[in-house]
Amino acid sequence: MPRGRMGGRHGMSTEKAKDFKGTMKKLMGYLTQYKIGLLLVVIFAIGSTVFNIVGPKILGKATTELFHGLVSKVSGGSGIDFDKIAKILIGLMCLYVCSALFSFIQGYIMTGVSQKLTYRMRKEISEKIDRLPMGYFDKMTHGEILSRITNDVDTLSQSLNQSATQVITSVATIIGVLVMMLSISPLMTVIAILILPLSMGLIGMIVKRSQRYFKEQQEYLGYVNGQVEEVYGGHNIVKAFNKEDDVIDEFDRDNDRLYRSAWKSQFLSGMMMPIMQFVGNLGYVAVVILGGYLAIKKTIEVGDIQSFIQYVRNFTQPIQQVAQVANMLQSTAAASERVFEFLEEPEEEAAPENPVVLKNPEGAVEFEHVHFGYNPEHTIIHDFSVKVEPGQKIAIVGPTGAGKTTMVKLLMRFYDVSGGSIKVDGHDIREFDRGELRRMFGMVLQDTWLFKGSIEDNIRYGKLDATHEDVVKAADAAYAHRFIQTLPGGYGMELNEEASNVSQGQKQLLTIARAILADPKILILDEATSSVDTRTEVRIQKAMDNLMKGRTSFIIAHRLSTIRDADLILVMKEGDIVEMGRHEELLAKNGFYADLYNSQFEQTA
């Protein structure tokens, strides 16, 4: 099934492995803005860890005291000193309360840092979208872009929030526990440490395997999102052409790829914990055997054995957490790289230092030897030249693929010409600020774009500071006022997300009203009367006539009957102007335009 707007699978199988180090370096650069918060996180995380580390040693003293009391009671002594044990346990409880408080504070601060980073990245992505050239959106699917704003940023935030804290606590725990273990028994410490090389080797093997699958998981999630968005937006077309089975088959293929990559990545990451627990238990058994032997030899106390056993457990926990952190860092790096790739995409050329500003534009437009191709290997417009006087009505006609819509994109500087120049009032459009240039243009497209909101707000989009009276006046000039009054709520009626609660013709009248309100000097009308009934077409044509009065107008239409009164008709074929003149002149030539015109009437007949 054709993918329509979604396009192809760009780079799915050929994309290179992520640059883990480079991506994490960029992420660290982003985090420098929050260095004070991160410093506090480090301080409180270390403080919480230290209190936890000291706990087992103190608890070991209580165990030793209990053991000595039992021995004393058996041998006829004073027995167990419960007061002393109680004091030890109260002190231990205070330590754990402080540890919990510090942990809460560092968690609160780290959550704030991660959410601020999320907010900043989403803001930068939103701003970046406005600066990207149109060519980027032609090659990327909506789902892929949406995935970067939602899935990738969320993944980055969540994994960063968890991994950053665990890295700090794990490192602090390993160092602190090692010191406490050495203070109890260097020999037992050596036995416990011997598990590290085995653990690190296993972690490295699993991380290396899982890294590729995590990246594939993020990619395929974007493809699935894109297809769902596309099918939902065009579900009527899918049903009309009985393509439900094709859509389901295509979704199943994409979903199966997502399933396989997600299954492999999650399976490998799930293996880390059992393997690390097994290795930790081996060390635990070895320490228990050696500790019992040293206690018999009176080298250490019984309470020291208990403390050391807890330290061994606490020593293996950070190793297991390192495995989890390595897993989360892969997700962080995969999501971060996709976000950074988007933020580093080439932008539209910056505005010139001293851009041209026209206070009273006249609307003269000139194409001088324009050459253009969407890629350098394939030029679709060859040496296009024409001069348009202010207020003229110019029609551009030709078969599909002739380059008509491309001319509009060049006028608006959605793309820049490969050769030659386009001038407005004698100034190359590259000398203008893009925003200033586009303010001189008004567009009425076949694909009418209306947003969720009231009808009045949609019309006012052409001029945000317009009054209600201005909106009504523009709607009246666009022959939209009458039908708006018949709608429930009138100008206050809310359009839904697809604007499906008004007809196609009404949508076009609203976009014409929007253009009239904006009062541009140059108009671009792209097949604006297609897909509507004859009566509505007449009404739209009258509205357009009002809109075009005193304005330079470029009309792109396949219905040649609508552009008979054009001042100049440009006939395009394969990127070149093959004929030029008024309607009657072109018919008299009996050339390509006449063939197009006559073929439409033959089809109608």
Please name every model-derived segment.
Residues 4-6, 10-15, 115, 123-147, ...:
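Short intracellular "coupling" helices and adjacent cytoplasmic loop segments at the cytosolic face
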Residues 23, 31, 110, 130-175, ...:
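Juxtamembrane loop-to-helix connectors within ABC transporter transmembrane domains
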Residues 28, 36-61, 92, 107-111, ...:
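Alpha-helical segments in transporter systems
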Residues 33, 37-50, 61, 162-216, ...:
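Transmembrane helices of ABC transporter permease
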Residues 33-36, 134-135, 153-160, 164, ...:
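An intracellular "coupling" helix at the cytosolic face of ABC transporter transmembrane type-1 domains
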Residues 38-102, 183-187, 298-302:
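Transmembrane helix-loop-helix hairpins at lipid-water interfaces of multipass membrane proteins
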Residues 180-194, 264, 268-337, 342-343:
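Helix-loop-helix
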Residues 351-352, 358-605:
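ABC-type nucleotide-binding domain
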